[in-house]
């Protein structure tokens, strides 16, 4: 899909103008395409390296801030007094100015973020679907599937939406496409498969890295659907040469591909999807003499600018797939698989309609409960932090053809062993979607537990002074951090990230980024914008204090119960100070960058997350 729920807003007016020009003057199609592409992409070049050009205000509330300074700035234009948050005039080692710049903000929370509306700007127009007279529905009397003997050759399939959008899409930019492609191709989760189907492999550079690096294990590869009519045994459906975006689907195989066909959906879709040549890739694979037929696809996204979130369009596209299968007259003793990001929520009404239209069996579902989850996946949360998790990706077996004794779909949530960074954004996620596996029987290479939980994820910090836990503001994602939680909750959990650490299971000392586990992409930072909140810590979107250190007082790997302190750098006074739990007035129990020595109020106990990792080994079926 180009998006989940809504996707990047392309310049609709320009596209429609292009479409009109092409329709009116077909002989000028190439010239108009080149001209329009230049006009479209030129304004975005200055932002092509940005993760997201949407400005989000995440600083704490201040009625009339004067030149607020970030904790990460090297210069402070207007330096407010670092005075006592409770106006009690403590000795302030960080203060060098007796004049207060701004009145103290209300003792509340930082301001609510106000991101630009990400709703699609595309219109609701849906192209008319041409009648498909090429296909005829097969005789249902000949629809009796044949069982595959369990001793016969089996197939293992991986599907993953890799979220590699065209890099010049407004506001989306390049979220580490090349770096993620390198990490995906070197990761364990793509190994030991027979077939891989990638969706959203739109970007040319990242796709080349991905395919080239995997070519040794998967030497048989198709072109990406919708790019060209060449390199296929046949190109069917509604191929639109004026589309500016390919369809993003590509298939890799360990075994010879005997036939490959691209089919562009007759229903061109709606919203942002209309501008892509979306469809499906069909391949016939010969594994040790056994033929397998695989269809890889990426159905219409759930775009808010589509009628009923694209349900009618997806229904038409699923009909295209089924009709194509009927037209191929595939022998009944050969397996047919339908694979991809189908953009249908599992167990919804549409889901059961899809099962019927595609004429497939429901698989046995195991693994993590969702394939797209903004509660656990940082990339998904980066763009859609308020969306509920959903299951969208599937590997189905056609009912009309050979049936395995069992068919399992395993949703898995791997992360990269090493982080990647682009334009200041750092993550260890491979994509906004999680991959899924389709297989008959599990084997020793089958993942049996979540790959997402790391040792220093969801840790808590208990104050040695008051026995309470530091927590993010339960009511505001960018609220103040306070050591006031009596028990551990979702809001007292934080993820520790130490970039460049080759052994992420052992953090001793050094620079860290501390992220709220409850509010992904919100990091510890301190406020310097005037008022009593100066040097108070809060959760800031995609902006961690870049000089925050964790110090283990025992100088060993951090373990449960380790005694620690935090140190950070004051960009104004150019000195380091320890974080402390404030103990007076209205700002009691707030976290501050304040002390130049260590006492009980600067000491915390690290609590590792004791929740067992999600394990589904008992749900798997082995031979």
Swiss-Prot record:
Region: Disordered; residue ranges are 51-121
Where found?
Secreted
Mention one GO molecular function.
Answer: sphingomyelin phosphodiesterase activity
Task: List UniProt keywords, sorted A-Z.
Answer: Hydrolase, Secreted, Signal
**Main enzyme class:** hydrolase
- UniProt cross-references to CDD domains, sorted A to Z: nSMase
> This chain belongs to which protein, by name?
Sphingomyelinase C 2
Q: Which organism is it from?
A: Leptospira interrogans serogroup Icterohaemorrhagiae serovar Lai (strain 56601)
């Amino acid at each position: 899909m180009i998006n989940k729920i809504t996707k990047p807003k392309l310049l609709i007016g320009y596209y429609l103008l292009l479409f009109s020009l092409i329709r009116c003057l077909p002989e000028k199609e190439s010239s108009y395409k080149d001209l329009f592409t230049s006009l479209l992409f030129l304004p975005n070049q200055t932002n092509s390296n940005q993760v997201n050009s949407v400005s989000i205000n995440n600083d704490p509330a201040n009625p009339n801030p004067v030149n607020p300074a970030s904790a990460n700035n090297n210069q402070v234009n207007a330096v407010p007094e670092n005075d006592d948050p409770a106006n009690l005039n403590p000795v302030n080692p960080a203060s060098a100015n007796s004049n207060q710049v701004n009145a103290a903000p209300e003792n509340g929370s930082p301001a609510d973020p106000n991101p630009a509306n990400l709703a699609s700007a595309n219109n609701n127009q849906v192209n008319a679907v041409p009648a498909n007279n090429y296909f005829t529905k097969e005789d249902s009397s000949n629809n009796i599937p044949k069982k595959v003997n369990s001793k016969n050759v089996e197939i293992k399939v991986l599907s993953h939406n890799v979220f590699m959008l065209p890099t010049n899409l407004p506001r989306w930019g390049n979220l580490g496409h090349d770096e993620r492609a390198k990490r995906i191709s070197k990761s364990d989760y793509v190994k030991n498969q027979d077939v891989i189907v990638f969706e959203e492999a739109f970007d040319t550079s990242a796709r080349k890295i991905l395919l080239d690096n995997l070519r040794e294990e998967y030497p048989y590869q198709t072109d990406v659907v919708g790019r060209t009519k060449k390199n296929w045994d046949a190109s069917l459906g509604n191929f639109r040469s004026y589309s500016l975006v390919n369809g993003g689907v590509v298939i890799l195989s360990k075994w010879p591909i005997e036939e490959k066909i691209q089919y562009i959906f007759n229903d061109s879709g709606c919203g942002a999807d209309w501008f892509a040549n979306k469809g499906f890739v069909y391949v016939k694979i010969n594994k040790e003499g056994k033929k397998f037929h695989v269809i890889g696809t990426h159905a219409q996204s759930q775009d808010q600018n589509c009628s009923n979130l694209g349900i009618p369009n997806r229904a038409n596209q699923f009909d295209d797939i089924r009709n194509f299968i009927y037209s191929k007259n595939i022998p009944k003793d050969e397996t047919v698989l339908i694979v991809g990001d189908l953009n249908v929520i599992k167990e919804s009404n549409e889901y059961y309609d899809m099962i019927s239209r595609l004429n497939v069996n429901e698989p046995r579902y195991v693994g993590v409960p969702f394939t797209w989850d903004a509660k656990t996946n940082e990339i998904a949360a980066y763009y859609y932090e308020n969306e509920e998790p959903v299951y969208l990706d599937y590997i189905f077996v056609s009912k009309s053809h050979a049936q395995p004794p069992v068919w399992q779909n395993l949703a898995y949530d791997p992360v990269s062993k090493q982080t990647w960074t682009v334009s200041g954004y750092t993550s260890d996620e491979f994509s906004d979607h999680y991959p899924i596996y389709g297989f008959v029987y599990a084997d020793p290479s089958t993942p049996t537990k979540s790959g997402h939980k790391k040792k220093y994820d969801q840790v808590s910090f208990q104050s040695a002074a008051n026995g309470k836990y530091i927590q993010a503001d339960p009511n505001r994602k960018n609220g103040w951090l306070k050591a006031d939680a009596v028990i551990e909750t979702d809001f007292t959990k934080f993820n520790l990230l130490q970039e460049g650490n080759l052994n992420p299971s052992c953090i001793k000392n050094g620079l860290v980024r501390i992220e709220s586990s409850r509010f992904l992409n919100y990091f510890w930072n301190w406020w310097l914008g005037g008022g009593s909140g100066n040097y108070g810590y809060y959760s800031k979107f995609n902006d961690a204090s870049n000089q925050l250190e964790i110090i283990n007082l025992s100088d060993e790997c951090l373990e449960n119960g380790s005694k620690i302190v935090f140190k950070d750098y004051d960009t104004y006074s150019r000195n380091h100070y320890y974080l402390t739990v404030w103990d007076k007035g209205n700002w009691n129990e707030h976290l501050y960058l304040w002390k130049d020595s260590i006492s009980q109020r600067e000491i915390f106990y690290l609590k590792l997350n004791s929740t067992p990792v999600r394990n589904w080994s008992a749900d798997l079926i082995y031979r």
